[in-house]
């Protein structure tokens, strides 16, 4: 029996803001009602105090030049080095460069108002990691789609870093309701997410992000048409095994299987000889085998067996519901990282089935 883990942005520590009606309420409930500022970085260095007049004169001279002595340490400003900090508690968040431009938490909500309509977002979860080094907001779009009568909900996720470790990322992702599979798909040439670095032009880029993503009724309808196309493509069990293998194995690994007289089916059925001869890792073999099992027995799979839609959901279902990463790591990986790319690649390969 497979367990449905739920949406990747719903995890222990994330704040449920589904009862909030306005952006202001969300910020307050999720603890995002703080601002971030940039400050100069100061270096702390030890000094040896011998008590001589020469040393006292030197320290006085250094203080006049901007240094600060406290106890047995001297503090000097670091040229062209900056840090970000929370202005409410004066907590440092990270080291950044001189051209780093801050994106306040409030800008995330302005984006939702621009993309969906003021006070039209159906808020889901929000929160921050650590002291506020990274924040996120998720909201459900008001328009759902149906794939052969199978409901799929559309979501927007906005993430931002305040510590210099990354930029702003805005993700459009559908979630299949029955199994909570995350369906990250780049529809034709339209990406499902955009990212911006913290440069001086970032605010202008965020303001037009909804145009870049095509986040609108058109985007949702386009995805629905694409999924219904997959639902009408008939596939065999052999097709699905090949599809899963091509998604999860490298071209070199597939070639080694052929060179040693084995097939992806041998790996899916956990053949020890195929594993040894092809030098494919046991971890990959387990993922392929478990994904193939999920194709038949995963939540919501029975009604879509024998279709490309079912094959895609086997991949997304494995990473959404079986893979053992949790919490913020699961959020990052499924929405933006390696797991996201696997799911997106599954959609790209499915059209060729």
Which stretches of residues belong to each language-model region?
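A short, surface-exposed helix-loop junction/capping segment
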Residues: 74-99
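Amphipathic alpha-helical segments
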Residues: 98-122
